[in-house]
């Protein structure tokens, strides 16, 4: 069970500090910052190449979803062994790219928020194909097991795209407006977070149907807010952050029992996972601080600081 976009962590960490227009590198053992790269714009999320030697980062532009300032049209290409900016891919139009994933064929997929689309990019030629999804795409996940891409469009449904045909084929209706989404390592289960409810929705990726609704205990269901979700690479845990509540919750993936929750610093966003399988990371965007915490208990083990606006973190081995 291996997900190209959610591999076990490595001895190195890379973190986006989007407000500062920087990317940081850290030693995962010591949490010492080992390098910083200046980015050409506000770089939000990253996807790694199959060989783990390249990171692709979406340059969304400044501001936040809907309240964009100078929306961008680029994807940065970072060489991980040399920790250098190798080049920049121009998407051909101002799309405000955000969520980004790599498929098994080597195609890079990203959201094209301003184009109501997802984009399929060939990193070898920089050719870009636009696939209309009928709404402001913000995040996506790839299920190689089913040959589908699932797309969050900040509505009360998730769009489904055929990976090979590169066209939208379905929409999965949900009880509330949703935003954050994640996928199990085997590609069989999609997890989606309610934006207008403190709920986690569990979708069967093959049947394209809602299977279960899980309450997020300790989160405020009356606030409309961004929630993000990730599944641990070993498929043991599901973690959820609630951005305005400064709250994180941990669920057992088997049965989805909530086993822990903890308070965070301001504006928790993206999760990453440590190589030991016992710890995870959480970026607290507004306080520019990353938590390392125990997955089994939620206990905070260590913290470290970044430049302004940490959003995304991933471990790697190159």
What are these regions (language model features)?
Residues 1-318:
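Predominantly soluble domains enriched in secretory-pathway, periplasmic, or organellar proteins
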């Amino acid at each position: 069970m291996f997900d190209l976009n959610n591999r076990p962590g490595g001895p190195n960490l890379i973190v986006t500090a989007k407000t500062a227009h920087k990317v940081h590198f850290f030693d995962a053992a010591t949490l010492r910052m080992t390098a910083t790269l200046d980015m050409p714009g506000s770089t939000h999320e990253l996807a790694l190449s199959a060989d783990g030697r390249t990171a692709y980062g979406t340059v969304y532009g400044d501001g936040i979803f809907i309240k964009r300032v100078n929306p961008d049209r680029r994807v940065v290409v970072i060489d991980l062994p040399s920790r250098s900016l190798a080049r920049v891919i121009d998407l051909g139009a101002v799309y405000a790219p955000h969520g980004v994933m790599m498929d098994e064929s080597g195609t890079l997929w990203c959201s094209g928020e301003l184009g109501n689309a997802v984009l399929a990019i060939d990193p070898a030629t920089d050719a870009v194909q636009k696939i209309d999804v009928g709404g402001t795409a913000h995040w996506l996940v790839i299920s190689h097991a089913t040959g589908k891409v699932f797309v969050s469009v900040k509505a009360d449904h998730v769009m489904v795209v055929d990976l090979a045909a590169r066209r939208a084929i379905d929409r999965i209706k949900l009880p509330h407006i949703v935003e954050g989404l994640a996928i199990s390592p085997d590609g069989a289960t999609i997890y989606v977070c309610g934006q207008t409810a403190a709920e986690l929705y569990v979708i069967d990726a093959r049947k394209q149907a809602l299977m279960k609704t899980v309450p997020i205990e300790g989160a405020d269901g009356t606030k409309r807010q961004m929630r993000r979700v990730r599944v641990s690479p070993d498929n043991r845990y599901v973690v959820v952050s609630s951005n305005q509540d400064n709250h994180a919750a941990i669920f057992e993936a088997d049965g989805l029992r909530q086993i822990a929750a903890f308070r965070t610093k301001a504006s928790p966003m993206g999760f990453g996972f440590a190589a030991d399988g016992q710890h995870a990371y959480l970026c607290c965007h507004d306080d520019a601080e990353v938590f390392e915490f125990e997955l089994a208990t939620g206990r905070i083990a260590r913290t470290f600081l970044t430049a302004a606006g940490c959003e995304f973190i991933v471990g790697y081995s190159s």
